[in-house]
């Protein structure tokens, strides 16, 4: 019986963003099945062979081995190399997924096993570490949907993403509610907050400088006014300014 060392310390690579499809290999499988060079591997009760979806339990693991999700250091690769050395073709007359799973029980280490099949559009492949013929530890899961292979997210990634989305939405809701809440305390009751004027900008400084220059020119022009106007002002003083209401600052209730 072949043995392997303990599982590697590194975590499995995250390929959740990868979608893999091999049209050339699928076309080759369709050609083999349409010409009768390989059995369909389906029960008599299953649907008729569909050239557009040639995957079956018999060839889906060979198709999965062409994807970046497959590990060449696995026991599946060792079995495939042994079959090639013995002249056994995996696609025509070779062992299927069930036979390969039974063969993998003789090894310990990394392996890929077909755990669910609904031909020809849905397959689930599990990556696991085998420590004995009866004990395995799941590491990752992959599913084949309509000839495309994906990596299934683990429970930790799903919960972390959902919790992060929930916390973000809750924080935004509380921030909006905080800005819209009324200002109230038992001692003062409802009260408003005065709006503080913004600091002067460079545009305001230029405007003030222009007004100062204009007032200076006006003052020089008034120096040439006849003294008669000043005497008339002393004789007939201007009427008192009309009473104006005090200006109130605008307030907003937060």
UniProtKB/Swiss-Prot annotation:
Residues 205-216 have a biased composition (Polar residues). Keywords: Activator, Nucleus, Transcription, Transcription regulation. Residues 205-254 are annotated as: Disordered. It holds the Pfam family Med6. InterPro entries: Mediator_Med6 (IPR007018), Mediator_Med6_sf (IPR038566). It comes from Mycosarcoma maydis (Corn smut fungus). This is Mediator of RNA polymerase II transcription subunit 6. Residues 219-236 have a biased composition (Basic and acidic residues). It is found in: Nucleus. One of its GO terms (molecular function) is transcription coactivator activity. The keyword Phosphoprotein does not apply. Component of the Mediator complex. Component of the Mediator complex, a coactivator involved in the regulated transcription of nearly all RNA polymerase II-dependent genes. Mediator functions as a bridge to convey information from gene-specific regulatory proteins to the basal RNA polymerase II transcription machinery. Mediator is recruited to promoters by direct interactions with regulatory proteins and serves as a scaffold for the assembly of a functional preinitiation complex with RNA polymerase II and the general transcription factors. One of its GO terms (biological process) is regulation of transcription by RNA polymerase II. One of its GO terms (cellular component) is mediator complex. Belongs to the Mediator complex subunit 6 family.
């Amino acid at each position: 019986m072949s043995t392997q060392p303990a599982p590697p310390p590194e975590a499995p690579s995250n390929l959740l963003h990868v979608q893999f499809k091999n049209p050339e290999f699928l076309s080759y499988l369709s050609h083999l099945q349409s010409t009768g060079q390989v059995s369909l591997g389906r029960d008599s009760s299953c649907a008729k062979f569909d050239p557009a979806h040639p995957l079956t339990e018999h060839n889906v693991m060979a198709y999965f081995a062409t994807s970046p999700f497959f590990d060449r250091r696995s026991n599946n690769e060792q079995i495939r190399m042994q079959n090639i050395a013995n002249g056994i073709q995996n696609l025509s007359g070779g062992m299927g997924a069930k036979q390969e799973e039974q063969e993998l029980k003789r090894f310990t280490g990394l392996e890929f096993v077909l755990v669910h099949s609904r031909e020809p559009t849905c397959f689930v492949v599990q990556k696991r570490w085998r420590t004995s013929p009866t004990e395995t530890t799941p590491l990752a899961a992959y599913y084949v949907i309509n000839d495309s292979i994906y990596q299934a997210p683990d429970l930790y990634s799903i919960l972390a993403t959902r919790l992060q989305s929930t916390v973000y939405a809750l924080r935004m809701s509380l921030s909006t509610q905080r800005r819209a809440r009324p200002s109230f305390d038992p001692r003062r009751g409802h009260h408003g907050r005065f709006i503080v004027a913004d600091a002067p900008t460079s545009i305001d400084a230029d405007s003030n400088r222009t007004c100062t220059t204009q007032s200076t020119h006006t003052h020089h022009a008034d120096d040439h006014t006849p003294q008669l106007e000043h005497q008339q002002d002393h004789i007939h003083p201007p009427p008192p300014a009309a009473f104006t209401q005090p200006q109130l600052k605008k307030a907003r209730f937060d």
